[in-house]
């Protein structure tokens, strides 16, 4: 229009302004990152100043630092400086009130950003989730065998198939789905445990969190409060949680209606053995409000991620050491026929337990353990000061220490089995044991309370798998090298194996094992 003509000279500026502002923001962010980044702790050796190097090869940096430094040392990471503390100090620190679980994990989990609420739920120091698992889930385990047995059998049949000829599968994806089904059967029951929308959420949210955290680490700290709104990975997290709330809300409404109906008739409301009820009951007892859907996603994500990784590693190890398969099957068949599905039966499966524990040692998921934040200065027995505000974690070097594990590079499925045969050692060296030479589940007051459920779930699934299927690597292929990211080690997502139903019928009925004698 003619009356705009005098201002046409401003048109190029109108287009250039957003680019100019974006450029200035980026420059300012890099300035802040360079000049206002967290400072390392004084008087503790620095092994690496390069946070990009930690991003690429943190696993190796930890190993190198352990060999070079006799005590603590520091590594610069994308979320600040980390102090690696030798495992010999874990006993003196395990009950120290100045070490916070939440403060040790909040920065790495990015809990202040929308979309990461499930991580925030897992990182609190208030013991809510620990109470749900320790009091509600663990004390209900004896009532859950039938659900875990049934869902693992049905899920394996549907996912792994019933073919008696070799089929090639991407086993990690399939195991993720099976574990999600079994875990959801326990946490939520029917119909959600077989609802594909729910299964997609709990399986994919773990992957999405990993990818979102990776992108956030690659983003300069000063830009994160802005950039996270636009990253596809963080958008996906928010979508997952919205979908989870949509699915969980009707279940909450049903529970609320059942409670109101019971009270209206003067009855005590019936307790339900599922995560929704557990969380409502614990939150009411603690006088706090929670987002139930977020906490259910958090609990599911934690359980599925670890169990899937261990289960996948177990199957791959069966391919690499097939000589152990017949002995494992013989133990499972004998004990199930003798005592059926009980806690004591699982306890007596010493060879299976030893096999799983050795898999976790040989294919450790993390090179470090027990992230903690110092809320006050902490002084170690050798005089090292861990300053207030610093983040520490312990090395897990004993799993490869010849003094604790002779010939540590060798996979020995009998390793813990032999140790438990020694007098006075029968109850030690178990998969669920908390020991300084086996810290897969942490140590001290924040040790994983869900390890007993993981133990039961893993053993039931492995019993089912071993009695029904044969497995091998794809002919001509080797086990692929694990993926290393920071201090984590993971099975590659595209790993393949071949599976077929065994030529003979299972020697024991998993639903009624004693009647099979």
Swiss-Prot record:
The chain crosses the membrane at residues 16-33. Its EC number is 1.-.-.-. Keywords: Glycoprotein, Heme, Iron, Membrane, Metal-binding, Monooxygenase, Oxidoreductase, Transmembrane, Transmembrane helix. Pfam families: p450. It is a single-pass membrane protein. GO terms for molecular function: heme binding; iron ion binding; monooxygenase activity; oxidoreductase activity, acting on paired donors, with incorporation or reduction of molecular oxygen. Glycans are attached at residue 204. One of its GO terms (biological process) is secondary metabolic process. The keyword Metal-binding applies. One of its GO terms (cellular component) is membrane. Heme binds at residue 448. Pathway: Mycotoxin biosynthesis. CDD domains: CYP503A1-like. It is found in: Membrane. Its cofactor is heme. It comes from the Eukaryota. Belongs to the cytochrome P450 family. Cytochrome P450 monooxygenase; part of the gene cluster that mediates the biosynthesis of the diterpene glucoside brassicicene C. In the first step of the brassicicene C biosynthesis, the bifunctional diterpene synthase bsc8 that possesses both prenyl transferase and terpene cyclase activity, converts isopentenyl diphosphate and dimethylallyl diphosphate into geranylgeranyl diphosphate (GGDP) that is further converted into fusicocca-2,10(14)-diene, the first precursor for brassicicene C. This is Cytochrome P450 monooxygenase bsc11. It comes from Alternaria brassicicola (Dark leaf spot agent). The gene is bsc11.
């Amino acid at each position: 229009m003619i009356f705009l003509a005098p201002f046409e000279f401003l048109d190029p500026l109108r287009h250039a302004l957003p680019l100019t502002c974006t450029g200035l923001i980026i420059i300012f962010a890099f300035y802040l990152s360079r000049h206002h980044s967290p400072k390392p702790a004084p008087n503790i050796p620095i092994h690496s100043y390069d946070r990009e190097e930690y991003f690429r090869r943190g696993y190796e940096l930890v190993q190198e630092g352990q060999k070079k430094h006799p005590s603590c040392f520091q590594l610069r990471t994308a979320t600040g400086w980390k102090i690696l503390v030798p495992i010999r100090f874990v006993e003196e620190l395990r009950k120290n009130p100045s070490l916070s679980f939440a403060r040790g994990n909040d920065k790495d989990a990015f809990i202040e950003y929308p979309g990461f609420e499930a991580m925030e739920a897992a990182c609190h120091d208030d013991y809510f989730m620990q109470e749900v698992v320790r009091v509600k889930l663990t004390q209900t385990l004896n009532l859950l065998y039938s659900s875990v047995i049934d869902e693992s059998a049905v899920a394996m049949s549907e996912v792994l198939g019933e073919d008696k000829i070799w089929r090639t599968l991407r086993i990690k994806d399939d195991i993720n789905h099976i574990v999600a089904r079994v875990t959801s059967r326990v946490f939520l029951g029917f119909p959600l445990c077989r609802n594909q929308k729910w299964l997609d959420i709990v399986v994919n949210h773990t992957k999405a969190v990993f990818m979102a955290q990776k992108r956030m680490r690659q983003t300069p700290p000063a830009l994160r409060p802005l950039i996270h709104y636009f990253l596809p990975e963080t958008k996906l997290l928010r979508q997952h949680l919205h979908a989870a709330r949509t699915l969980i809300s009707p279940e909450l409404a049903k529970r609320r209606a059942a409670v109101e109906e019971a009270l209206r008739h003067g009855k005590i409301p019936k307790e339900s053995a599922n995560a929704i009820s557990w969380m409502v009951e614990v939150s009411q007892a603690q006088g706090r409000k929670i987002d139930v859907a977020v906490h259910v996603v958090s609990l599911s994500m934690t359980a599925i991620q670890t169990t899937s990784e261990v289960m996948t590693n177990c199957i791959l190890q069966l391919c690499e050491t097939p000589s152990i398969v017949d002995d494992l099957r013989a133990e499972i068949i004998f004990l199930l026929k003798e005592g059926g599905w009980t806690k004591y039966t699982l306890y007596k499966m010493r060879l299976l337990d030893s096999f799983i524990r050795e898999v976790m040692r040989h294919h450790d998921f993390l090179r470090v353990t027990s992230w903690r934040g110092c809320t006050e200065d902490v002084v170690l027995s050798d005089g090292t000061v861990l300053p207030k505000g610093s983040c520490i974690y312990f090395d897990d070097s004993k799993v490869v220490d010849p003094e604790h594990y002779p010939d540590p590079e060798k996979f020995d499925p009998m390793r813990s089995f032999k140790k438990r045969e020694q007098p006075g050692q029968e109850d030690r060296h178990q998969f669920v044991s908390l020991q300084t030479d086996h810290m897969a589940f942490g140590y001290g007051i924040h040790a994983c309370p869900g390890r007993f459920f993981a133990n039961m779930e893993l053993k039931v699934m492995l019993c089912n798998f071993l009695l029904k299927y044969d497995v091998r690597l794809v002919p001509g292929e080797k086990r692929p090298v694990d993926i290393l990211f920071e201090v984590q080690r993971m099975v590659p997502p595209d790993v393949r194996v071949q599976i077929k139903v065994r030529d003979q019928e299972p020697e024991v009925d998993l639903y009624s094992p004693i009647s099979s004698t």
